[in-house]
């Protein structure tokens, strides 16, 4: 039997469980989380003796994020809005992490920036009707426009319902 460990960490943008809907606050929470992982790595013994400040998440989560912060494991962020994609690229550059982007409904709008950052994207079939405000600019040609700009594009399934699966014909 061949078995491989985890290959990536996945995070969503704008998740209701994040406790915020403000984008600036959301990114502040990501920065605090990554700063906490770095602090935890440097002061693990102090953490275990209760001599550190309270961190943003549990010890198990801090441990799980160490390979991401160290650049050994990619972080897959699910983002749609062009401004959020650019913010994710800035975040990855600031923290020196390997980043993959998923969904990227408005990726075609910032395809040059994604290509310049050498960040691969995972896209699926979509139609011209947005599902939320973050994907108002989505286009059926998103994957083709990203590829034409030099972005590495991975085609993924976008859902299990009949309607979502039916949109496979819309990949261009």
Language-model regions: role of each:
Residues 1-99:
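Polyanionic/metal-chelating signatures
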Residues 46, 100-104, 155-158:
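Surface-exposed patches in mature extracellular/periplasmic domains of secreted proteins
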Residues 74, 112-172:
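His/Asp/Glu-enriched, well-ordered alpha-helical/loop segment
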Residues 74-80, 98-107, 126, 130-131:
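Catalytic beta/alpha-barrel core
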Residues 82-86, 106-111, 161-163:
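Active-site environment of divalent metal-dependent phosphoester hydrolases
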Residues 89-92, 105-108, 143:
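Histidine-anchored nucleotide/phosphate-binding helix
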């Amino acid at each position: 039997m061949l078995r491989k460990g985890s290959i990536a960490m996945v995070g969503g943008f704008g998740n209701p469980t994040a406790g915020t809907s403000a984008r600036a606050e959301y990114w502040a929470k990501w920065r605090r989380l990554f700063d906490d992982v770095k602090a935890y790595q440097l002061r693990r013994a102090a953490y275990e003796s209760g001599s550190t400040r309270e961190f943003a998440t549990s010890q198990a989560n801090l441990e799980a994020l160490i390979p991401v912060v160290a650049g050994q494991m990619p972080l897959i962020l699910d983002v749609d809005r062009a401004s959020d994609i650019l913010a994710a690229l800035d975040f990855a550059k600031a923290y020196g992490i390997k980043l993959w982007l998923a969904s990227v409904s408005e990726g075609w709008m910032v395809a040059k920036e994604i290509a310049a950052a050498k960040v691969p994207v995972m896209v699926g079939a979509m139609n011209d009707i947005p599902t939320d405000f973050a994907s108002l600019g989505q286009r059926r040609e998103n994957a083709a426009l990203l590829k034409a700009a030099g972005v590495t594009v991975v085609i993924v399934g976008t859902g299990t319902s009949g309607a979502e699966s039916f949109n496979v014909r819309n990949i261009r």
